UniProtKB/Swiss-Prot annotation:
Residues 1-5, 52-60, 106-108 are periplasmic. GO terms for cellular component: plasma membrane. The chain crosses the membrane at residues 6-26, 31-51, 61-81, 85-105. It is a multi-pass membrane protein. This is UPF0060 membrane protein YnfA.
Length: 108
């Protein structure tokens, strides 16, 4: 379970970075060269999703829970926004959903 969660976390970071770098280019006028590491990050994101033994749709659904939590961590650390009680509650619900799906992988 820990290995799966850690893999989902790294996958989420790759997706967020792959989307954040083009955002910097478009919104903040960063160099167009940031699109190269963005593309590499998104390619790594896709590859990491293939490392799970479950069906792709199940992997995507479970990954979503960890993505929500990782995005909120990004919001706090990178964007400097303080999380609200609604953020924490949403993260908890998302993680519970991920846990239910992952535990069920071996039972189907």
């Amino acid at each position: 379970m820990l290995k799966t969660t850690l893999l989902f976390f790294v996958t989420a970071l790759c997706e967020i970075i792959g989307c954040f770098l083009p955002w910097l280019w478009i919104k903040r006028g960063a160099s167009v060269w940031w699109l190269l590491p963005a593309a590499a990050s998104l390619a790594l994101f896709v590859w990491l999703l293939t490392l799970h033994p479950a069906a792709s749709g199940r992997v995507y659904a479970a990954y979503g829970g960890v993505y929500v939590c990782t995005a909120l961590l990004w919001l706090r650390v990178v964007d400097g926004v303080r999380l609200t009680v609604y953020d924490w509650c949403g993260a908890l619900i998302a993680l519970c959903g991920m846990l239910i799906i992952v535990v069920g992988w071996g039972r189907t």
